[in-house]
């Protein structure tokens, strides 16, 4: 999907083989995006643009947008969700810090209620095949295999990606998921 959304947000999605960075190692990271406050579609588009501006990084795939039922705190507006693949030279901790900075600075996100409403939520799902259990970072995302609103868009762009802890493909986790979440492709 090269050029996808480029006119709307100023970011192009190039084929991975066309990427060229000034560093030795690129890693494919998968990032979930979610919004249920304000203009949800515009928030996702803006977030893709902001992530696409990260140094040593390029958005190489973007799923469709999905309208999804809230999980946890259910008395809130439905979410729009998507997943993108980012080819990056940033290490996982730096990438996560940059994602949190986008939430805070570009979207003025204030965390008041866990799983509550938000203008944008950016979660680092996978960072290559890395398994990281740090004080400030856990990769793969600990609830990745439990969430249809993440697995469905992930499977759209990377059905064969392997979860480094389970050894299973994303599409296998989606097929095995027993969830009552509503996930509708827009």
Roles of regions detected by a PLM:
Residues 4-5, 21:
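Aromatic (phenylalanine/tyrosine) cluster motif
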Residues 12, 21-22:
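Short, positively charged and aromatic/hydrophobic N-terminal segments
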Residues 26-30:
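Extreme N-terminal starter segment of soluble prokaryotic enzymes
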Residues 35, 84-88, 128:
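Short beta-strand-to-loop capping motifs
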Residues 46, 51-91:
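Short, surface-exposed acidic-centric catalytic microdomains
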Residues 63, 71-78, 90-97, 101-186:
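Flexible, gly/pro- and Lys/Arg-enriched active-site loops
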């Amino acid at each position: 999907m090269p050029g996808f959304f480029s006119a709307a947000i100023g970011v192009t999605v190039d084929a991975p083989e066309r990427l060229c960075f000034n560093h030795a190692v690129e890693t494919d990271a998968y990032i979930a995006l979610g919004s249920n406050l304000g203009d949800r579609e515009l928030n996702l588009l803006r977030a893709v643009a902001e992530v696409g501006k990260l140094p040593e990084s390029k958005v190489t795939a973007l799923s469709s947008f999905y309208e999804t039922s809230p999980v946890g705190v259910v008395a809130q507006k439905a979410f729009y969700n998507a997943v993108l693949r980012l080819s990056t030279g940033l290490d996982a901790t730096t990438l996560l810090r940059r994602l949190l900075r986008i939430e805070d600075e570009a979207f003025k996100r204030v965390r008041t209620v866990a799983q509550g409403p938000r203008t944008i939520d950016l979660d680092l799902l996978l960072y290559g095949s890395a398994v990281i259990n740090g004080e400030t970072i856990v990769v793969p995302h600990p609830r990745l295999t439990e969430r249809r609103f993440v697995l469905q868009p992930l499977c759209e762009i990377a059905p064969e990606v392997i979860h480094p802890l389970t050894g299973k493909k994303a599409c296998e986790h989606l097929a095995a998921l027993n969830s009552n979440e509503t996930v509708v492709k827009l």
